[in-house]
């Protein structure tokens, strides 16, 4: 649910910026473009940390699965295998969520870059269209 609220707010922010760029509204456009570099850097750092955590979870998972395969009795293995299946699904869900966030970030970057180029090409005089 939180992701949907975040996506809706991000979409609304891009729509508002697009309208400001169309009006050559420097007061609204410039702060958004100026903050973009920091926002992108933070996204990259957060994505790296999440991917690092996913990789660590996968390595731990693989080690435990290997140990179970090598040492488990048939009855115990069944219960432990079920836990591993659920944990594997959780890790894959995290990876899919991160991949979706990266995809959306790429689309957002493309939109921001296109709006910035439009603004620079059409609003270079320093006068706002009102």
Residue ranges and their predicted role:
Residues 24, 28, 52, 62, ...:
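Short, flexible helical or helix-coil boundary motifs
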Residues 47-83:
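Extended alpha-helical coiled-coil "stalk/arm" regions
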Residues 45, 52-53, 71, 82, ...:
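Intrinsic disorder/low-complexity segments enriched in polar/small residues
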Residues 10-59:
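Immediate post-signal-peptide N-terminus of mature secreted/exported proteins
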Residues 1-12:
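Classic N-terminal secretory signal peptides
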Residues 28, 32, 89-130:
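C-terminal amphipathic alpha-helix
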